[in-house]
Curated annotation (Swiss-Prot):
One annotated Gene Ontology cellular component of this protein: core mediator complex
Name of the protein this chain belongs to: Putative mediator of RNA polymerase II transcription subunit 7
The keyword Cell wall biogenesis/degradation belongs to this UniProt entry's keyword annotation: no
Lineage: Eukaryota, Amoebozoa, Evosea, Eumycetozoa, Dictyostelia
Subcellular location: Nucleus
Protein task: Component of the Mediator complex, a coactivator involved in the regulated transcription of nearly all RNA polymerase II-dependent genes. Mediator functions as a bridge to convey information from gene-specific regulatory proteins to the basal RNA polymerase II transcription machinery. Mediator is recruited to promoters by direct interactions with regulatory proteins and serves as a scaffold for the assembly of a functional preinitiation complex with RNA polymerase II and the general transcription factors.
Amino acid sequence: MNTSQQQQQQQQQQQQQQQQQQQTPQQVENVSAFPPPPPFYKLYLNYKKDVDYSKPTTENSKKNDTPEGNESTIEKNIDNSDEMNIDNNNNNNNNNNNNNNNNNNNNNNNNNNNNNNNNNNNNNNNKATTSTNKKIELNKPLAPPLPPKVGANYVQFGQTYSTVDMLPSLDESGAKQLYPKGDIEPISELKKLNRSILFNYLQLLETLIENPKNYQSKIEDISLLFINFHHLLNSYRPHQARETLLSIMNEQIKQKNQSNESIKKALDICKESLMNSFKNLNIEDKQIDSATPLPTNITSPTKNLMSPTKLNNSQDVNMNENNDDDEDKEINWMDQLLDEMLKIN
């Protein structure tokens, strides 16, 4: 029983110690970046203020009484001082070397950081330029494909086409030609094919009523008729295009003739209105001239005195000459205007 109790007590003590260790914070050693201090600090550890080092102790006095003891102590002190100086110098050199090494390491780290930053910047710039180039390339429209060469074939919507617009014959397409070959009248042949299509359609209705199983042959006949009908229409396309072009040109000629006639009518109306306006202007000028008084010369009344009959005659002559000149000018102006308008037309 005693042994079991002792074991339990020991276990309890161990648990308490573990709990205390967990509760107590772990002591972290102070790690400094500076080098360790020199060993001369050990001199100050044994320093005591109460002790008077000026007075010699009993042991030292006993030793110092003999000349051999004095010499030995002096030599020991000298050796200790030399050793201390050597240690101090070595420590100082080590400290300086450590500082230099630390500075060199710091400079190297700074240079490496700068190089890394420059490399990162260059990489970022390269990425930015590549991204911009990609965006520019995406924004650019796609270049159209090159056109096929003359005589070559190309595929469009799953079908092959030729660059030369040639209508293949029915034999080349694998169908039977029902209308005759050579020079034919396409209109009459189209009418025949249309009638045959209607006749075969009626026969198809009869077969569906009497024998519904035998409808396949009539459907094949109708499909062959439609193929021939479409082929003949396609061969007639150039003639149709020529006729449509002729009709369009005839309509344009009619429209131009109508526009010319309307312009001529407008010119005649303008001529009449201009002539009427000029006539009205001449009448107004004559009325103004008749209302003006006769001129008199005050300086030489004897020389310029004339009979009223002579004055009236001279005024009439002058008026007639002026009117003739005005009419000639009006006629010339009208002729020029008409000539210019005709040139424009």
